[in-house]
Amino acid sequence: MDDYAVLSDTELAAVLRQYNIPHGPILGSTRKLYEKKIFEYETQRRRLSPPSSSSSSFSYRFSDLDSASVDSDMYDLPKKEDALLYQSKDYNDDYYEESYLTTRTYGEPESVGMSKSFRRPGTSLVDADDTFHHQVRDDIFSSSEEEGKDRERPIYGRDSAYQSIAEYRPISNVSRSSLGLSYYPRSSTSSVSSSSSSPSSWLTRRAIRPEKQAPTAALGQDRQVPLWGQLLLFLAFATFLLFVYYSIQAQEGNPFWMDP
């Protein structure tokens, strides 16, 4: 700590910049704090540095700090040389190099598998792309074959249209138990001449028509008079009947009633 008291404010600021220690203006109240930070930094570096290079690499000449032109040469910290020294001598101390991107420990060999792990997804993406193209081709071929089959099919009448719609519609429990079928029969060439009296067309029409009549029933329910309106109409009608009854009774009970 006494070595730093000899330094001027400019020299102390140069040391702080060289050590990458954030600082402000050096005043009488802040000088002791900056000297303490420099002392702690150098103590940590001596503890983490190898014993052989502690006297050579980290020796600083504080007596030759008169000229400001040689500040960078006097306080040069060989960070790259320290890294090479740690890698050559295989030191496993917890010495970290902090940067804005990564934090890496010196002395640990760089993993070669990282490049492989980044290359593998590329091959997997290529394989996935190939399989996707094959699936698209298969879908195109299958769709073209289905279109060809649809063109070969004959044009059905109205009854067959009901059957084609109903082949995806399950029969109700009553009709399934009576007919012993799980689904409606599929349309085929034998059903071209089917008439309206066939059971399949009758069942399909019966299954489709209630769905069409459901909106009309809902509209009819919406148009009905609400309950409170019905009660008001009933009370008005009862009042009218009572008025008629009392008027008749008054005419019959009056003996002096004379017809005009």
Curated annotation (Swiss-Prot):
Residues 187-201 have a biased composition (Low complexity). The modification Phosphoserine is found at S8, S29, S49, S54, S69, S72, S88, S99, S142, S143, S144, S172, S175, S177. It holds the Pfam family LEM. The chain crosses the membrane at residues 225-245. GO terms for cellular component: cortical endoplasmic reticulum; cytoplasm; microtubule; nuclear envelope; nuclear inner membrane; nuclear membrane; nuclear outer membrane; nucleoplasm. InterPro entries: Emerin, LEM/LEM-like_dom_sf, LEM_dom, LEM_emerin. One of its GO terms (biological process) is regulation of canonical Wnt signaling pathway. Residues 1-45 form the LEM domain. Disulfide bonds: none annotated. GO terms for molecular function: actin binding; beta-tubulin binding. Residues 169-188 are annotated as: Interaction with CTNNB1. It comes from the Eukaryota. Stabilizes and promotes the formation of a nuclear actin cortical network. Stimulates actin polymerization in vitro by binding and stabilizing the pointed end of growing filaments. Inhibits beta-catenin activity by preventing its accumulation in the nucleus. Acts by influencing the nuclear accumulation of beta-catenin through a CRM1-dependent export pathway. Links centrosomes to the nuclear envelope via a microtubule association. Required for proper localization of non-farnesylated prelamin-A/C. Together with NEMP1, contributes to nuclear envelope stiffness in germ cells. Interacts with lamins A and C, BANF1, GMCL, BCLAF1 and YTHDC1/YT521. Interacts with TMEM43; the interaction retains emerin in the inner nuclear membrane. Interacts with ACTB, SPTAN1, F-actin, CTNNB1 and beta-tubulin. Interacts with SUN1 and SUN2. Interacts with TMEM201. Interacts with NEMP1. This is Emerin. It comes from Rattus norvegicus (Rat).
